[in-house]
Amino acid sequence: MAVNLNPPQAGQLPAVAGVELLVAEAGIKTPGRKDVLVVKLDKGNTVAGVFTRNRFCAAPVQLCQEHLAAGVQIRALVVNTGNANAGTGFDGRARALSVCRAVAERDQLQTEQVLPFSTGVILEPLPADKIVAALPALRQADWAEAAEAIMTTDTLAKAASRRLDIGGKAVTVTGIAKGSGMIHPNMATMLGFVATDAAVTRPMLNQLVREVADQSFNSITVDGDTSTNDSFILISTGQSGAELIDSAEQPAYQQLKQALLEVAIELAQAIVRDGEGATKFITVDVNGGRSVAECKDVAYAIARSPLVKTAFFASDPNLGRLLAAIGYAGVADLDVDRLSLYLDDVLVACEGGRNPAYKEAQGQAVMNQSEITVRVELGRGSASARVWTCDFSYEYVRINADYRS
């Protein structure tokens, strides 16, 4: 059951000029459901991406990186669900390449102008023949349908959009994502595609995709597992008529970055809210560190702890688990006497131990909520970090135990 999350509405997801969405049913895993998405891009676009750091990265991830590095203009993306094409060796690469080739031939493109993406079961051969056979049946779709076409264990589709004004020109940012389990940076079993009609040079788009990913998709965890297929793609079509963004010093750069961040954070949070079996959405804020890195270490120690997450599921104010997680986060020479721990606005621990004024009823009241903030004040610097996570429920175990059955 998703936590305070609603399915996207097509009317709230404006089209992005220069982007065409098409979907089809290939019967990869579930007959009759949309499981192939093709994103066609007009000439003059720019594409950037960041990908999983898992050493067993999937064949389509490898091809995406190679095609982007080739320097050709990307004109199409092809996404399949139901099969990850990971752990499939040379054969998996050949199958992914055959899908790229078929999409390219359909639209008179070079194979290198197509980026492939897959998500689903690992160690299974990609049914490339089914995907290729479904291409003639592709039909136009809106962003909401596109979001549905990339779902796996997601219970709800995920999409977001923003509109902004750059120099008197209307600019649109719209994106979709999928993910529900195996979520932990960098990045997650996550596919994210965000498009804008703003005009951005390749160097600036590469910078934007990294900055946006770090503050959104790289700040979430559901279960601490890092997928083989993570991909976050940023597309600039340049068709809004707004000024070209070619420097991070331009006000337009910051305007666009803010809109992209809002969309990406909404998508990233939706993944956590739809975490497999999630009943609670938890924000972990860590402040007062010497570096962002150590703040994130503390935040993730809390956010991925099974003991912490099961306590949240049970609404059990067993908050010593939070202190234990902070203690093993690996922060060098941490002075616990200067640390403060809050549950929402309730001061739970300070000066090395339990706050004398803290009452368990206060903690219980917070733990009963569906949305909770854990705040840690390290008291040793000015850096901060924020991470989003969810609880562990019985349903998480059931979903993953039954995943292939």
Swiss-Prot record:
Pathway recorded for this protein: Amino-acid biosynthesis; L-arginine biosynthesis; L-ornithine and N-acetyl-L-glutamate from L-glutamate and N(2)-acetyl-L-ornithine (cyclic): step 1/1; Amino-acid biosynthesis; L-arginine biosynthesis; N(2)-acetyl-L-ornithine from L-glutamate: step 1/4
Keyword match Amino-acid biosynthesis: yes
Annotated site residue numbers, Involved in the stabilization of negative charge on the oxyanion by the formation of the oxyanion hole: 119-120
SUPFAM superfamilies: DmpA/ArgJ-like
Pfam families: ArgJ
Subcellular location per the Swiss-Prot or TrEMBL entry: Cytoplasm
GO biological process, one term: L-arginine biosynthetic process
EC class (word): transferase
Signal sequence bounds: none
Active site: 189 (nucleophile)
One GO term describing the cellular component: cytoplasm
Site (described: Cleavage): 188-189
Known catalytic reactions: N(2)-acetyl-L-ornithine + L-glutamate = N-acetyl-L-glutamate + L-ornithine; L-glutamate + acetyl-CoA = N-acetyl-L-glutamate + CoA + H(+)
Enzyme Commission number(s) of this protein: 2.3.1.35, 2.3.1.1
NCBIfam families reported for this sequence: ArgJ (TIGR00120), PRK05388.1 (NF003802)
HAMAP family found in the cross-reference section: ArgJ (MF_01106)
Protein name (Swiss-Prot/TrEMBL): Arginine biosynthesis bifunctional protein ArgJ
Record gene name: argJ
